[in-house]
Amino acid sequence: MFDVNRIRKDFPILEEKIYGKPLVYLDNGATTQRPLRVVEKMTEYYLRYNSNVHRGVHYLSNKCTDANEQARETVREFINAESTDEVIFTRGTTESINLVAYTFGEAFIREGDEIIVTEMEHHANIVPWQMLCERKKAVLKVVPFNDKGELDMEVFRGLLNERVRLVCVAYVSNVLGTVNPVKEMIDAAHALGAYALVDGAQAIQHIPVDVRALDCDFFAFSGHKVYGPTGVGVLYGKRSLLEQMPPWQGGGEMIKEVRFEKTTYNELPFKFEAGTPDFIGVVGLGEALEYVKSIGLQEIAEYEHGLMDYAMRQVREVPGIILYGDAANKSSVISFGIEGIHPFDLGTLLDKMGIAIRTGQLCAEPVMQHY
């Protein structure tokens, strides 16, 4: 049975009072809170086992290395990747997407090629592609969405042609909560010989993800959106593509042999993990995913869906409320405005009541401009 009161006790911050009021935390789209077991696991490694990974033969180094590689296996299982070689640790979704833009972009994008994004993307899935298009003289195409917050799939299909090399789409919109038809878009891209990247930052914590069933070429997400620490994220990539992509950053760990005449690079996934990683953050991410598994992601999804439906019904009854996004397939995010009230004023007022919400452009200005 899904016991929300028991789950709340796993998060000590929810016992806090803000201006004398019980904390109501509704800003999970920006960052989730951490359950106590994640904090305790990271603290254990800082206090008892702290040592660099993949660089020593002593007990502490081996202990941390084993924990990091176990976390990689946890991620692999969580998203159903074929191999841990396809799981690359990064600083977050933004770095994961930039890694693809610089490495896949270097190897696969040529002048005149086209990259497709959607109007509802987070800035992190727009700006790297704009920069790549500037470097390579490629062309960025945009799929619009309607006022319900659903992608115009007819326009998407019309944009597909032999020049398209990459389709980049959010699994779930961070503003609208729309669950996009990513499988359909991936299949359509592949039918023309193009590749597909999925921004999974707002999906990984809400709905089961199976990268092999999706058949996506790349999948990116952040630890701090799924009850893990900040500063750690994941890039999944198909091995066949990762092997063809050049390293992004140079330094320790990503090398096999260094000579002044020539350097050879490490095997996957380490080719893309230059320098000392946030190895204790990785341990925290692994523990966060184990926490989610202990509850059950399907159970979480079902509970959240009921909660969202209830909240949407209640919000519609409030005079002056303007809802943004009412897609038929929607998950976990409700965005709204109130007539005659500036978002920052509303956010400040709610803060005084102990309620934390996100206000502003939500790192998705094109979405805000749509409305």
Question: Which residue ranges define each predicted feature?
Answer:
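Pyridoxal 5′-phosphate
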Residues: M1-Y371
